[in-house]
Amino acid sequence: AKPNSNYILFTLVIFFISNYCYEVASIFYNSLLKKCSNENDIGKTSGLGFALGYIGSVPIMLLTLYLFVLPETVPFGLDKSKFENIRFVPLVVALWFLVFSLPMIYYFKKKISYEDNFDSSPSFKKIIEIIWKNKFTSTGKFLLARMIYSDALIVLIAGGGVYASGVFGYTPGELLKLAIVANVVAFLGVLIGGYLNDKLSSKKIILFCILVLTATVFYGSMIAQTKTEFFYNVMVISFFIGSIQSASRVMMTKLLETKDLGKGFGLFSFSGRITAFAGPLLVGTVTYLYSQRLGL
């Protein structure tokens, strides 16, 4: 792909394929949580998984920032005027993703037995029964709620950079630095959240995070006027956003029987994506008609 309008469709197709593969992989990845933890430490295990994901992204972002974004002359003879330095970054990320997936692939292949993990004869009826048995099951109610609040999380994660750039004038380099600090804060937040998940409950963690995130987003969109205010606002959001993701996975794991983990996490992924367009569409519409602040 090249940085002109002729490659928009091609880029979207590639993005669709990569995102689809990621979502499918996450179904099986999430369904292994019960196998990797004990009943009394499932929150810490889930939190540690998310925490390592957040902190593990920091080195690659630093590498990207200081090798490809900030220098006037970048490696491999890449031409910054043609955005080749930016276009090269996904290749580095793809390699990073592959290399650090290998230990998990090798370990689970050798150490984990799958024979009691999944129903060998799934059917549409069995899938429906997970969420509906004459009325919504507890799992169905949770997935319905998650479908709503996950839309808000998608807007925060996907649209935060656009908002920071449009309202507070963040440059690409500043956005990357902000993301690095935010990921470190998220690492700490989700570790604490995972520990508290085992002490309290997933439901309490989720509700508290929703309350804090709602108040914080309101402050950042309607009150914050300076970059400093916005920076601390992002830090608070980062601290809690990982905890709600981790607690959601734990709650789903506890709601499902072992044989339903594959089907259940398929629905879990589906519920997070089926209305994924709604949040960005609403924000985009309000932003277009009024302002970015009201949109957020």
Regions inferred by a protein language model and the residue ranges of each:
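Helix-to-loop junctions at the C-terminal end of transmembrane segments
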Residues: 189-202, 287
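Juxtamembrane intracellular "pre-TM" segments in multi-pass secondary transporters
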Residues: 109-144
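Short amphipathic helix-loop junctions that connect adjacent transmembrane helices
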Residues: 158-175
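Loop-to-transmembrane helix entry/capping segments in MFS-fold secondary transporters
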Residues: 39-49, 172-173, 258-268
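A membrane-interface helix-boundary motif in multi-pass transporters
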Residues: 66-95, 285-296
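Intracellular juxtamembrane helix-capping segments at the cytosolic ends
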Residues: 24-37, 243-257
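Helix-loop junctions at membrane interfaces in 12-TM secondary transporters
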Residues: 2-14, 221-233
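Structural signature of the two symmetry-related core transmembrane helices
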Residues: 1, 204-219
